[in-house]
Swiss-Prot record:
It comes from Kineococcus radiotolerans (strain ATCC BAA-149 / DSM 14245 / SRS30216). NCBIfam families: recf (TIGR00611). Keywords: ATP-binding, Cytoplasm, DNA damage, DNA repair, DNA replication, DNA-binding, Nucleotide-binding, SOS response. The RecF protein is involved in DNA metabolism; it is required for DNA replication and normal SOS inducibility. RecF binds preferentially to single-stranded, linear DNA. It also seems to bind ATP. It is found in: Cytoplasm. The keyword Cytoplasm applies. The gene is recF. GO terms for cellular component: cytoplasm. ATP binds at residues 30-37. GO terms for molecular function: ATP binding; single-stranded DNA binding. One of its GO terms (biological process) is DNA replication. Pfam families: SMC_N. This is DNA replication and repair protein RecF. Belongs to the RecF family. CDD domains: ABC_RecF (cd03242).
């Protein structure tokens, strides 16, 4: 798979942009603040409907404009597809696929697959559990786009149940509590939560081997990286399906466990007005040499872990696509080489060099390792919101 053409209208610093892209490596070179990250961010937005830099859409629209438009012409296994996104802050975004409107914007998920490496990735190791849950869920949606609907339903139900807990807790303290409605929302949360949790556990099982081998590749063979899953459910806290070789519970078993745990925690939830049970409380556990990576890994080791997670994502998607799309997902490396020591830079570049399309941003050409600066590499100079191909 590769992006053949990118078109922007009022996206970030670009009033307009038309840019042809080819398979192989393309480096976007420019000083900080010139707009090179905006280009790869736009490509990532087509793939994920989100930015790796900001949580909302408003910053994506150029100052003074009402909306931004991103169009990406894609080629995959000899087939072409055109994805068009219209981003309007405060309103529902709109999408087209091959010129035809889609019913829901998320219906274009899966058309373009990308794996992004960025300086923010260090938060996968050093950040809070929400960063690691986001990593899992974004990869889930990339592999199985229908999970986007499951996640959206879960988030909506979680918000409604939290609001009900707050109001019911106040009513309980006044002696007029009615928990029947809460029982109904418990059922909804348990059903969608079990589906999301089951998908995460299946993904975790698939990730373990490629993550460890990817970590070894970028670290130079130093140590073992293991993945675990920390859950608020006693069923999973006992270690079932959260460690290598564990057998995953069925979705029905997870649903029943969620219901039982919510019932057990109900008084505490009503007192605090928050949902204490569910996949929104869980964490991906990273263990390096038998010790938690967070808090124990050095800066360099933390980078190796983060890169290992991203490379494992790439290898997993590549294996998924090897029949229909031998080239696999588009790799995006956004200013990541400037963060790495020489050894990790060279090892990472050697691992990704064979991808069908690699998009790299760098402040200066020298930041790009030699393995990604071959004769077939395109260079695009980015200055003040303009992108010009050159030597």
């Amino acid at each position: 798979m590769h992006v053949a053409h990118l078109s922007l209208v009022d996206y970030r610093s670009y009033p307009t942009l038309e840019l042809d892209l080819r398979p192989g490596t393309t480096t976007f070179v420019g000083l900080n603040g010139q707009g090179k990250t905006n280009l790869v961010e736009a490509i990532g937005y087509v793939a994920t409907l989100g930015s790796h830099r900001v949580s909302g859409d408003a910053p994506l629209v150029r100052q003074g404009a009402e909306r931004a438009v991103v169009r990406a012409q894609l080629e995959r296994g000899g087939r072409r597809a055109l994805v068009e996104l219209e981003i309007t802050p405060g309103k529902a975004n709109r999408a087209r696929l091959n010129g035809n409107p889609v019913r829901r914007t998320r219906d274009v998920l899966g058309v373009l697959r990308t794996v992004l490496f960025a300086p923010e990735d260090l938060a996968l190791v050093k950040g809070d559990p929400g960063e690691r849950r986001r990593y899992l869920d974004e990869l889930l949606v990339t592999r199985w786009p229908r999970i986007a609907g499951v996640r959206a339903d879960y988030d909506r139900i979680l918000r409604q149940r939290t609001a009900l807990l707050k109001s019911a807790g106040s009513a309980m303290r006044s002696g007029r509590a009615d928990t029947h409605t809460l029982d109904v929302w418990d059922e909804h949360l348990a059903t969608t939560g079990a589906e999301l949790l089951s998908a995460r556990l299946a993904l975790l099982a698939d990730l373990r081997s490629p993550t460890d081998s990817a970590y070894r590749a970028v670290s130079g063979g130093q140590g073992d990286l293991e993945l675990g899953y920390r859950s608020s459910l006693p069923l999973l806290a006992e270690g079932v399906a959260t460690t290598p070789g564990g057998e995953a519970p069925t979705r029905d078993a997870l649903r029943e466990a969620l219901l039982a745990s919510m019932l057990e925690q109900r008084k505490s939830e009503l007192d605090r007005g928050v949902c204490l049970v569910g996949p929104h409380r869980d964490d991906l556990v990273l263990t390096l040499g038998g010790m938690p990576a967070k808090g124990y890994a050095s800066h360099g080791e933390s980078w190796s872990v983060a890169l290992g997670l991203r490379l494992a994502s790439y290898r997993l998607l590549l294996a998924d696509d090897e029949v229909d799309d031998p080239g696999g997902p588009v790799l995006v490396l956004d200013d990541v080489f400037a963060e790495l020591d020489a050894g990790r830079r060279e090892r990472l570049s050697e691992v990704v060099a064979d991808a069908e399309q690699v998009l790299v941003t760098a402040a200066v050409p020298e930041d790009v390792p030699a393995a990604l600066r071959g004769e077939h590499t395109d260079r695009v100079h980015v200055t003040s919101g303009a992108a010009v191909r050159g030597d």
